[in-house]
Amino acid sequence: MAVIKKPDLSDPVLKMKLAKGMGHNYYGEPAWPNDLLYIFPVCIFGTFAIVIGLSVMEPAAMGEPANPFATPLEILPEWYFYPVFQLLRVIPNKLLGVLLMAAVPAGLLTVPFIENINKFQNPFRRPIATTVFLLGTVVAVYLGIGSTFPIDQSLTLGLF
């Protein structure tokens, strides 16, 4: 496999481009050292300059100062803990809630053993794994959305 494409110098359009200094990246100029030593550092420094300039012109707001004596009415975890928080909030027995949280990875570990005879990578040809994935995604999104509602509306998402 050739690294450099040899130019067809019988083409008059190419001759005109090469005479004007155009077409050299496509016809014969190697990437090392021309592009890697000159163009890439310019792009990298330009990106750093833009990021630093934007951070200086518009710094992130620090928010209001912390007050340990004024706590919010309802404390919510980070967004990626919303489904787990909703499970612990809705299930009346806390031990059952913790067991359900442990059942999620245990159930995911069983999927390869259930579907071990199917060697396809196409998700449409692996119905059990696809169903587990889609059902888990829908349940996680439902629980995550429900955790942002008050406790009396969290199961119905305020719709009923």
Curated annotation (Swiss-Prot):
GO terms for molecular function: electron transporter, transferring electrons within cytochrome b6/f complex of photosystem II activity; electron transporter, transferring electrons within the cyclic electron transport pathway of photosynthesis activity; ubiquinol-cytochrome-c reductase activity. Its main location: plastid. Gene3D superfamilies: plastocyanin oxidoreductase (1.10.287.980), Single helix bin (1.20.5.510). It is a multi-pass membrane protein. It is found in: Plastid, Chloroplast thylakoid membrane. The chain crosses the membrane at residues 36-56, 95-115, 131-151. PANTHER family: CYTOCHROME B, CYTOCHROME B_B6 C-TERMINAL REGION PROFILE DOMAIN-CONTAINING PROTEIN. Component of the cytochrome b6-f complex, which mediates electron transfer between photosystem II (PSII) and photosystem I (PSI), cyclic electron flow around PSI, and state transitions. The 4 large subunits of the cytochrome b6-f complex are cytochrome b6, subunit IV (17 kDa polypeptide, petD), cytochrome f and the Rieske protein, while the 4 small subunits are petG, petL, petM and petN. The complex functions as a dimer. This is Cytochrome b6-f complex subunit 4. It comes from Stigeoclonium helveticum (Green alga).
